[in-house]
């Protein structure tokens, strides 16, 4: 079976993946490879599990691109904890346990453009029915319906479409939950980070304060057991605070509210922009550069984030100065964990004439 759970490790996901099944259903989206090439690759890859039957079908998607389905049956259960185990070249294979091989095979063969088979198909075992008796029709339970949907769906869109057609009332009343489960079943593959913000030279009266904070907290790695320090910048709008903060490297960026569902474990730092003190969730953990804490995403399950200590850059305009809303205890914690820079009149995080520095 294929399972997922929470984990703070992993480059592509914070989930723990496990697949163990003799029958495996694979989908290669936007994949133009020949079925024979895919099938022979799967046969060599799973030789230790004694492959008995492989079916690979190529068909066209609604947008005109090719994609391939494969049914792999082995004598021994195919076991892996690597969600990229079945990847071929740059094409990622979505892995599902084929709990109903008959239905999976029927689904794969619904509209084939090219097909390749090897071995002898092993049909699903059926319950014994005495001679002269017809098997009773049994209405599938919701669990069975959802199991079939999760087995056959190949994308978030197809998953939600199948839920809508099979369970219309649940889809209408619990759409948020289905959207969350769709995002967990079909997570986005993390792309290499590209910084969209050019570096800027700031025009400050006290550059040393910023430089002294940057070196140990952004440019240097943590020593074992060491925690970073955050940075608080308060000042007028259009002084380049946001552009400068976002130009330093890979980061989590939140403006107006914090969405934990998009938390990037590979980020070097966080940016909290224009979020009032009293409306910033987990502010103590963010300011204190803590790690391995539990958050509660909207419409999602509680999860652990921050596998490492990273600093947070907090940006505020003068009318939302965090220090004005703090109790003495808040101020004490803030000063112990966060450097502060209050912009004076005329100070900017860009030189006059630089493009993109007016945020």
Swiss-Prot record:
Location of the motif RCR-3: 107-110
Biological processes per GO annotation: DNA replication
Residue window of motif RCR-1: 25-28
Functional note: Essential for the replication of viral ssDNA. The closed circular ssDNA genome is first converted to a superhelical dsDNA. Rep binds a specific region at the genome origin of replication. It introduces an endonucleolytic nick within the conserved sequence 5'-TAATATTAC-3' in the intergenic region of the genome present in all geminiviruses, thereby initiating the rolling circle replication (RCR). Following cleavage, binds covalently to the 5'-phosphate of DNA as a tyrosyl ester. The cleavage gives rise to a free 3'-OH that serves as a primer for the cellular DNA polymerase.
Active site positions, chain numbering: 107 (for dna cleavage activity)
Residues annotated for ATP binding in this entry: 235-242
Locations listed in the record: Host nucleus
Family: Belongs to the geminiviridae Rep protein family.
Region Transactivation: start-end pairs: 258-276
Chain residues that bind a divalent metal cation: 59, 67, 69, 111
Record remark: domains: There are 3 rolling circle replication (RCR) motifs. RCR-2 is probably involved in metal coordination. RCR-3 is required for phosphodiester bond cleavage for initiation of RCR.
Residues annotated as domain CRESS-DNA virus Rep endonuclease: 18-121
Alphabetized Pfam families for the sequence: Gemini_AL1, Gemini_AL1_M
Protein name: Replication-associated protein
GO molecular function, one term: DNA binding
Major place of residence: host cell
Domain of life (superkingdom): Viruses
GO CC terms: host cell nucleus
Cofactor: record remark: Divalent metal cations, possibly Mg(2+) or Mn(2+).
Regions annotated as coiled coil: none
Subunit description: Homooligomer. Rep binds to repeated DNA motifs (iterons). Forms the O-complex, which is a Rep-DNA complex involved in the initiation of RCR. Part of the C- and V-complexes which are RepA-Rep-DNA complexes involved in the c-sense and v-sense transcription.
Keywords annotated in UniProt: ATP-binding, Covalent protein-DNA linkage, DNA replication, DNA-binding, Endonuclease, Helicase, Host nucleus, Hydrolase, Metal-binding, Multifunctional enzyme, Nuclease, Nucleotide-binding, Nucleotidyltransferase, Repressor, Transferase
């Amino acid at each position: 079976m294929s399972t997922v759970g929470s984990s703070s490790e992993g480059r592509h996901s914070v989930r723990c993946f496990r697949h163990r099944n003799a029958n495996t259903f694979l989908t290669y989206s936007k994949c133009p490879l020949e079925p024979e090439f895919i099938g022979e690759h799967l046969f060599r890859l799973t030789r230790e599990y004694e492959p008995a039957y492989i079916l690979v079908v190529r068909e066209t998607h609604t947008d005109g691109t090719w994609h391939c389905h494969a049914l792999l049956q082995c004598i021994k259960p195919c076991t892996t904890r690597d969600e990229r185990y079945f990847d071929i070249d740059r094409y990622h294979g979505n892995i599902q346990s084929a709990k109903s091989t008959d239905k999976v095979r029927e689904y794969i063969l619904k509209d084939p453009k090219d097909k390749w088979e090897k071995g002898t198909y092993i049909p699903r075992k059926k319950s014994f029915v005495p001679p002269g008796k017809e098997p009773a029709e049994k209405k599938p339970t919701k669990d069975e319906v959802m199991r079939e949907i999760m087995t056959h769906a190949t994308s978030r869109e197809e998953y939600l479409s199948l839920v809508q057609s099979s369970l219309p009332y649940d889809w209408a009343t619990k759409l948020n939950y289905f959207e969350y489960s769709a995002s967990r079943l079909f997570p986005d593959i993390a792309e290499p980070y590209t910084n969209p913000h050019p570096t800027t030279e700031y025009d400050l009266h006290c550059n040393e304060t910023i430089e002294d904070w940057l070196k140990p907290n952004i440019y240097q790695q943590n020593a074992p057991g060491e925690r970073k320090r955050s940075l608080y910048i308060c000042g007028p709008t259009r002084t380049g605070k946001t552009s400068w903060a976002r130009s330093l490297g890979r980061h989590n960026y939140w403006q107006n509210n914090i969405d934990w569902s998009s938390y990037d474990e590979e980020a070097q730092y966080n940016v909290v922009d224009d979020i009032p003190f009293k409306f910033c969730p987990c502010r103590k953990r963010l300011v204190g550069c803590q790690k391995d804490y539990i958050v509660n995403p909207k419409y999602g399950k509680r999860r652990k984030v921050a596998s490492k200590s990273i600093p947070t850059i907090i940006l505020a305009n003068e009318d939302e100065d965090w220090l004005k809303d703090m109790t003495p205890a808040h101020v004490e914690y803030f000063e112990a964990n966060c450097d502060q820079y209050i912009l004076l009149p005329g100070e900017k995080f860009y030189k006059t004439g630089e493009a993109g520095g007016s945020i």
